Amino acid sequence: MLPSTVQTLTLLLTSGGVLLSLYVSASLSYLLYSDVLLKFSSTKTTAPTMSLECTNASNAQTVNHSATKEMTFPPPEPEWTYPRLSCQGSTFQKALLISPHRFGEIKGNSAPLIIREPFVACGPKECRHFALTHYAAQPGGYYNGTRKDRNKLRHLVSVKLGKIPTVENSIFHMAAWSGSACHDGREWTYIGVDGPDNDALVKIKYGEAYTDTYHSYAHNILRTQESACNCIGGDCYLMITDGSASGISKCRFLKIREGRIIKEILPTGRVEHTEECTCGFASNKTIECACRDNSYTAKRPFVKLNVETDTAEIRLMCTKTYLDTPRPDDGSIAGPCESNGDKWLGGIKGGFVHQRMASKIGRWYSRTMSKTNRMGMELYVKYDGDPWTDSDALTLSGVMVSIEEPGWYSFGFEIKDKKCDVPCIGIEMVHDGGKDTWHSAATAIYCLMGSGQLLWDTVTGVDMAL
């Protein structure tokens, strides 16, 4: 809190005596909570002064005997952020397309970076568009290897949301082939994972300082979520996993405060394979995540993490609408909610975001239009219910990417308005040039706004042959 009283004492000395003037300012206070944000800037207070003139007949002269005392009040430290109710709306609409390679014509600093695994994270003042680059641009001469997931050149980069991730626009945060980031209300936390497959390392950066690390625990490609971590009251929660892409891979959550790990959380329940979780706040008490099982099922593992007890449990989503790719026909998996069903090896990160309302909650999901390939992207919603036990089909809201266009990873995030949060889903639209040329992505963003129906899909507008 600010000091309750600020006193400014101005002492004016004159040739005729001492004039003492005491000015006491009114108490300064501020209120900052989940739905109120007051922005302060440095305030300079100057005590009033008096100019005394002395004149004689022989030598007219003006003498200023006043003294001025200035005090600067520093702005209060920003407050931690908390989830708030979502802004009003009943449908998502196309908000933004970031298609860097529409500008891939000239080499140099203005050339777009070759990226993959984009995501967006937001603080109180701005959202940033993150991605993992191969330290190469298009056009350029370093296309070889840009289809690989892991190498020594990959870095976590970001630009302010709405800017094109070119060489000159991008901030390079750290070496990483897997990443995450989030804002706690005061500062950014950046997460990067790199290193050899059998001994990878989580690295944490808070603001400009590299602050902590976390070592591999299964020695099989330690990796993180490729979307935003989630902060409440200064505590940020990050999902990591370590294990085989075609077998067991048990996830953990790291509780991070001001860039330092203060607790690790080992989930219970259906823990065989959980990776690439997309997480958000269902309430001030619970973080929920829709994740990927690359090994056993096309159903999404669904995490509930209690931030009051720091405990987490995982079960499979029970809905008949299967969200992974590849996947069987909807409703074709027999048995209880925990039944895996048939699984073709592979999977994809899925978009997921909450719509928090006073009387109910909406959960929005994305999935590819194709059951077998990373093509197209649809948006689904389910109001209320429990994803662990509710077997009803999800409601199709609309098509964000047509089946003729690429639909790869997707993610969720929330933009902070003045008094509410705007839920959004982003889609990675990959230009897949194979092993012989560049391999990079555009990002489409859809956000909750207004009512009616989702009206228009997104195209990248990129011809790789040009």
Curated annotation (Swiss-Prot):
<keyword id="KW-0106">Calcium</keyword>
<feature type="disulfide bond">
    <location>
        <begin position="231"/>
        <end position="236"/>
    </location>
</feature>
<comment type="similarity">
    <text>Belongs to the glycosyl hydrolase 34 family.</text>
</comment>
<feature type="glycosylation site" description="N-linked (GlcNAc...) asparagine; by host">
    <location>
        <position position="284"/>
    </location>
</feature>
<keyword id="KW-1032">Host cell membrane</keyword>
<feature type="active site" description="Nucleophile">
    <location>
        <position position="409"/>
    </location>
</feature>
<keyword id="KW-0378">Hydrolase</keyword>
<feature type="disulfide bond">
    <location>
        <begin position="122"/>
        <end position="127"/>
    </location>
</feature>
<keyword id="KW-0325">Glycoprotein</keyword>
<keyword id="KW-0326">Glycosidase</keyword>
<feature type="glycosylation site" description="N-linked (GlcNAc...) asparagine; by host">
    <location>
        <position position="64"/>
    </location>
</feature>
<feature type="binding site">
    <location>
        <position position="297"/>
    </location>
    <ligand>
        <name>Ca(2+)</name>
    </ligand>
</feature>
<keyword id="KW-1133">Transmembrane helix</keyword>
<keyword id="KW-0812">Transmembrane</keyword>
<dbReference type="GO" id="GO:0055036">
    <property type="term" value="C:virion membrane"/>
</dbReference>
<dbReference type="InterPro" id="IPR036278">
    <property type="entry name" value="Sialidase_sf"/>
</dbReference>
<keyword id="KW-0735">Signal-anchor</keyword>
<feature type="disulfide bond">
    <location>
        <begin position="277"/>
        <end position="291"/>
    </location>
</feature>
<feature type="active site" description="Proton donor/acceptor">
    <location>
        <position position="149"/>
    </location>
</feature>
<keyword id="KW-1043">Host membrane</keyword>
<feature type="binding site">
    <location>
        <position position="150"/>
    </location>
    <ligand>
        <name>substrate</name>
    </ligand>
</feature>
<feature type="topological domain" description="Intravirion">
    <location>
        <begin position="1"/>
        <end position="8"/>
    </location>
</feature>
<feature type="binding site">
    <location>
        <position position="324"/>
    </location>
    <ligand>
        <name>Ca(2+)</name>
    </ligand>
</feature>
<keyword id="KW-0472">Membrane</keyword>
<feature type="binding site">
    <location>
        <position position="293"/>
    </location>
    <ligand>
        <name>Ca(2+)</name>
    </ligand>
</feature>
<keyword id="KW-0479">Metal-binding</keyword>
<dbReference type="GO" id="GO:0020002">
    <property type="term" value="C:host cell plasma membrane"/>
</dbReference>
<dbReference type="GO" id="GO:0004308">
    <property type="term" value="F:exo-alpha-sialidase activity"/>
</dbReference>
<feature type="disulfide bond">
    <location>
        <begin position="87"/>
        <end position="420"/>
    </location>
</feature>
<comment type="function">
    <text>Catalyzes the removal of terminal sialic acid residues from viral and cellular glycoconjugates. Cleaves off the terminal sialic acids on the glycosylated HA during virus budding to facilitate virus release. Additionally helps virus spread through the circulation by further removing sialic acids from the cell surface. These cleavages prevent self-aggregation and ensure the efficient spread of the progeny virus from cell to cell. Otherwise, infection would be limited to one round of replication.</text>
</comment>
<feature type="transmembrane region" description="Helical">
    <location>
        <begin position="9"/>
        <end position="31"/>
    </location>
</feature>
<feature type="binding site">
    <location>
        <position position="346"/>
    </location>
    <ligand>
        <name>Ca(2+)</name>
    </ligand>
</feature>
<feature type="binding site">
    <location>
        <position position="116"/>
    </location>
    <ligand>
        <name>substrate</name>
    </ligand>
</feature>
<feature type="disulfide bond">
    <location>
        <begin position="182"/>
        <end position="229"/>
    </location>
</feature>
<comment type="subunit">
    <text>Homotetramer.</text>
</comment>
<dbReference type="InterPro" id="IPR001860">
    <property type="entry name" value="Glyco_hydro_34"/>
</dbReference>
<dbReference type="GO" id="GO:0005975">
    <property type="term" value="P:carbohydrate metabolic process"/>
</dbReference>
<feature type="glycosylation site" description="N-linked (GlcNAc...) asparagine; by host">
    <location>
        <position position="56"/>
    </location>
</feature>
<feature type="binding site">
    <location>
        <position position="292"/>
    </location>
    <ligand>
        <name>substrate</name>
    </ligand>
</feature>
<keyword id="KW-0946">Virion</keyword>
<dbReference type="Pfam" id="PF00064">
    <property type="entry name" value="Neur"/>
</dbReference>
<feature type="region of interest" description="Involved in apical transport and lipid raft association">
    <location>
        <begin position="13"/>
        <end position="35"/>
    </location>
</feature>
